[in-house]
Regions:
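An N-cap/entry alpha-helix motif that binds or orients negatively charged groups
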Residues: 2-72
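Alpha-helical segments flanking ligand/cofactor-binding loops in enzyme cores
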Residues: 6, 78-82, 109
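Conserved, mostly hydrophobic/aromatic
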Residues: 8, 59, 84, 92, ...
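Alpha-helix-loop-beta-strand connector modules within alpha/beta enzyme cores
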Residues: 39-54, 102-126
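Glycine-rich, flexible loop/turn motifs
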Residues: 44, 67-71, 91, 97, ...
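Structural preference for beta-strand elements that scaffold enzyme active sites
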Residues: 56-60, 91, 118-120
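Glycine-rich beta-to-alpha transition loops that act as phosphate-gripper elements at the mouths
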Residues: 60-64, 73-75, 100-102, 121-131
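Alpha/beta enzyme core
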Residues: 72-95, 114, 128-131
Length: 131
């Protein structure tokens, strides 16, 4: 009997195979390095260690989960990120797994465009081509 984790990993292996077969993905490392070289760092550790006192909250953006099912389909990533920031979150965790969590790399990009808070990409990364 397959576990949900083994199902997720099987799906990620398929995604990696498709990415590796796609000619546009072959220069991923160079593109990633160029993006990183021009990016402003968003330092999670600094946010967690800040002297502002109180509890540090990493808020999570998630549409669904394998165990709970659909949480909410009508969520706007940018609206939620804005609310989290106003509510005092020091960072936002963004689920990007599509099949099992209803997330998307587009959610991560939209949230990045909305807030300067540090972001965590939460996904099942099994190969560097996924980054």
């Amino acid at each position: 009997m397959a576990t949900i984790l083994s199902e997720i990993l099987d799906r990620k292996r398929e995604v990696v195979a498709r990415l590796r077969a796609d000619p546009a993905s072959r220069d991923f490392r160079d593109r990633g390095l160029a993006i990183r070289a021009n990016a402003t760092p968003h330092l999670l550790l600094r946010a967690l260690e800040s002297n502002s006192g109180g509890v540090k909250i990493i808020a999570e953006f998630k549409r669904r989960s394998p165990s709970a099912g659909t949480i909410r389909n009508d969520l706007s990533a940018t609206d939620i990120a804005t609310r989290y920031e106003r509510g005092g979150a020091c960072a936002i965790s963004v689920l990007t797994d599509e099949q099992h969590f209803g997330g998307s790399i587009l959610d991560l990009g939209a949230i990045r465009a909305t807030t300067a808070l540090p972001l965590l990409r939460k996904d099942f990364i099994i190969d560097e081509i996924q980054i």
